């Protein structure tokens, strides 16, 4: 994980500049928010990056956002854009906020964790989700690890098998509402 953090520290500006703003994630975010009552619209955004476009969309949809990212450079960008929200430099693997959220989003972040760390995240998700809260995360289609090249530097990705994700979710009190 330190390599991923270092990657984003070194490339925050370039990644933010190149990150699409067209919000291809909108369908998933709308499905996440639809059943959540207005008073529960406090979203924990794990691996929030620079806040674009996910946090912006959540904020514009009336959510309060608490964003967590291991990269201080990314958090600085989020805080500059959305100073009324809460932004913290923390490692999601050791998160202990003593707060529960109506929704947790880990979009394009969770898959940067090693497989053993992904397994260990499910109790952390459970500890931070409100009753009837919803969890949205991205993963790969099958168990495996990959190191891609971005900006001439290696960037780690991993995924468990979808069946293992379903088992981990069930063991931690989650029900799969949609998988695609």
Predicted regions and their residues:
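Conserved class I S-adenosyl-L-methionine
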Residues: 1-38, 143
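Class I SAM-dependent methyltransferase SAM/SAH-binding core
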Residues: 44-46, 50-94
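A conserved beta-strand element that flanks and buttresses the S-adenosyl-L-methionine
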Residues: 105-106
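A short His-aromatic
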Residues: 112-113
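A short glycine-rich, Lys/Arg-flanked "PGG" loop and its adjoining helix->strand segment in the class I
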Residues: 119-131
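Conserved beta-strand signature within the Rossmann-like core of class I S-adenosyl-L-methionine
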Residues: 132-139
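Acceptor-substrate binding/catalytic loop of class I
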Residues: 148-164
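Conserved S-adenosyl-L-methionine
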Residues: 174-180
């Amino acid at each position: 994980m330190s390599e991923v953090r270092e990657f984003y520290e070194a490339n925050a500006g370039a990644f933010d500049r190149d990150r699409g703003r067209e919000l291809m994630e909108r369908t998933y975010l709308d499905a996440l928010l639809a059943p959540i009552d207005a008073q529960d619209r406090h979203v924990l955004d794990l691996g929030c990056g620079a806040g674009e476009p996910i946090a912006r969309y959540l904020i514009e949809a009336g959510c309060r956002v608490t964003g967590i990212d291991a990269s201080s450079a990314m958090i600085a960008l989020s805080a500059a854009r959305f100073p009324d929200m809460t932004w913290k430099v923390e490692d999601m693997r050791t998160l202990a906020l003593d707060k529960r959220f109506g929704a947790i989003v880990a979009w394009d972040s969770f898959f940067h964790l090693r497989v053993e760390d992904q397994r260990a995240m499910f109790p952390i998700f459970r500890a931070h989700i409100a009753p009837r809260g919803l969890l949205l995360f991205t993963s790969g289609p099958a168990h495996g690890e990959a190191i891609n090249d971005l900006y001439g530097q290696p960037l780690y990705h991993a995924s468990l098998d979808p069946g293992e994700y379903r088992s981990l979710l069930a063991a931690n009190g989650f029900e799969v509402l949609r998988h695609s």
